[in-house]
Amino acid sequence: MSSMRAERVGEQMKKELMDIINNKVKDPRVGFITITDVVLTNDLSQAKVFLTVLGNDKEVENTFKALDKAKGFIKSELGSRMRLRIMPELMYEYDQSIEYGNKIERMIQDLHKQDR
């Protein structure tokens, strides 16, 4: 399997997952999330779903618990929307790149304030 196919399937999966999680998952523990990336293995057997959650650490933890509990539902919804022979195993990971970028931005702003 080419990695180009894995990238295309990952982009489509990202769109579908956002729709499923925002509109179909009814668990109140699921907070406001943004899926930043979906990385599939070349054989499309596993998908790492990178996401950010708006909220504190407790809300992040509750969101991941809710997504883990709804994994079967999400996978079946995804299967009905995407034409794949085997639906990949979903693994959720917290994406810290947004927080890291915000931290760098604050540091740069602080340096500019010190220069004035």
UniProtKB/Swiss-Prot annotation:
GO terms for cellular component: cytosol. It holds the Pfam family RBFA. SUPFAM superfamilies: Ribosome-binding factor A, RbfA (SSF89919). InterPro entries: KH_dom-like_a/b, RbfA, RbfA_dom_sf, Ribosome-bd_factorA_CS. It comes from the Bacteria. Keywords: Cytoplasm, Ribosome biogenesis. GO terms for biological process: maturation of SSU-rRNA; ribosome biogenesis. GO terms for molecular function: ribosomal small subunit binding. Its main location: cytoplasm. It is found in: Cytoplasm. The keyword Cytoplasm applies. Belongs to the RbfA family. NCBIfam families: rbfA. Monomer. Binds 30S ribosomal subunits, but not 50S ribosomal subunits or 70S ribosomes. PANTHER family: RIBOSOME-BINDING FACTOR A, CHLOROPLASTIC-RELATED (PTHR33515:SF1). One of several proteins that assist in the late maturation steps of the functional core of the 30S ribosomal subunit. Associates with free 30S ribosomal subunits (but not with 30S subunits that are part of 70S ribosomes or polysomes). Required for efficient processing of 16S rRNA. May interact with the 5'-terminal helix region of 16S rRNA. This is Ribosome-binding factor A. It comes from Staphylococcus aureus (strain NCTC 8325 / PS 47). The gene is rbfA.
